[in-house]
């Protein structure tokens, strides 16, 4: 019941955001917005969630709350040995050793997680950047120099390899976030953006780029997909003939994940301890 009340408040505040010069409105708004940010931060709510049908629903009002958070906050010094100047603080700035141990989160020097991003248990964060409203589920590793964009949803037991870009989406507000479902492996220097959904158990090879308009072609059936990688697909970069003897980029599903593939990408439990 309280969540529905907060949702209604956020929607009303969003409609009246042009009136934020009114200090009283700004003060009232902060209470509701802070509640949403704390719920996001604890993982009790998320920007997108999977329905029993297998479809993903995006909660627009939560994205609105994140944007309103930027409107209501002032830039401030964020001092945590290093020094930054931003509206959104470091998720871990007030954490102590006991909390890290209890949640079994390993955060390597050089990683930065903005407040309102949720990090599940047994997650390993190498030097990487996790943006506002993102959701990183349990058992996942975010490898070096990877970026998880605003509101992106990363499933359980995923490996996001070095230098990967997972696109964010707070603008335009109606767009869906990138979703990487459970047990996926995203190869180094790959980029997934524009609301693409990578379904459970899929493997993207090194340097695969997928946006909403990228052709994803199944080599065996010649079927073309847009915006979604089917479950348990092994995907590599490719090209397809176009007009005037010019080839254009595409992503190619070369096979379904098999035991040989699984052995190459299996999680190293030693690194998760």
Curated annotation (Swiss-Prot):
Catalytic reaction annotation: (S)-2,3,4,5-tetrahydrodipicolinate + succinyl-CoA + H2O = (S)-2-succinylamino-6-oxoheptanedioate + CoA
Recorded GO MF terms: 2,3,4,5-tetrahydropyridine-2,6-dicarboxylate N-succinyltransferase activity
Binding of substrate, residues: 106, 143
Record SUPFAM superfamilies: Trimeric LpxA-like enzymes
UniProt keywords, alphabetically: Acyltransferase, Amino-acid biosynthesis, Cytoplasm, Diaminopimelate biosynthesis, Lysine biosynthesis, Repeat, Transferase
GO CC entries: cytoplasm
Matches recorded under Gene3D superfamilies: Hexapeptide repeat proteins, Tetrahydrodipicolinate-N-succinyltransferase, N-terminal domain
Protein name: 2,3,4,5-tetrahydropyridine-2,6-dicarboxylate N-succinyltransferase
Organism, scientific name: Wolbachia pipientis wMel
Source lineage: Bacteria, Pseudomonadati, Pseudomonadota, Alphaproteobacteria, Rickettsiales
Gene behind the chain: dapD
């Amino acid at each position: 019941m309280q969540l529905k009340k907060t949702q209604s408040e956020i929607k009303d505040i969003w409609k009246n955001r042009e009136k934020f010069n009114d200090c009283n409105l700004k003060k009232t708004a902060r209470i509701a917005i802070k509640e949403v940010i704390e719920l996001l931060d604890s993982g009790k709510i998320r920007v997108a969630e999977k329905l029993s049908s297998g479809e993903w629903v995006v909660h627009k009002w939560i994205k609105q709350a994140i944007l309103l958070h930027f409107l209501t906050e002032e830039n401030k010094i964020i001092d945590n040995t290093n020094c930054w100047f931003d509206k959104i603080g470091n998720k871990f700035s007030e954490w102590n050793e006991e909390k890290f141990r209890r949640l079994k989160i390993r955060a390597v020097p050089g990683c930065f997680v903005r407040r309102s991003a949720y990090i599940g248990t047994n997650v390993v964060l190498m030097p990487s950047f996790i943006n506002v409203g993102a959701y990183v589920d349990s058992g996942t590793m975010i490898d070096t120099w990877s970026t998880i964009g605003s509101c992106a949803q990363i499933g359980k037991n995923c490996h996001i390899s070095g230098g990967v870009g997972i696109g964010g989406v707070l603008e335009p507000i109606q767009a869906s976030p990138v979703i990487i479902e459970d047990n996926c492996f995203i190869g180094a220097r790959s980029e997934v953006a524009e609301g693409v959904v990578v379904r459970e158990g899929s493997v993207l090879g090194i340097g695969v780029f997928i946006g909403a308009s990228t052709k994803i072609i199944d080599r065996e059936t010649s079927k073309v997909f847009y915006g979604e990688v089917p479950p348990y697909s092994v995907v590599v970069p490719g090209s397809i003939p176009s007009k005037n003897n010019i080839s254009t980029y595409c992503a190619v599903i070369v096979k379904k994940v098999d035991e040989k593939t699984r052995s190459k990408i299996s999680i190293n439990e030693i690194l998760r301890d």
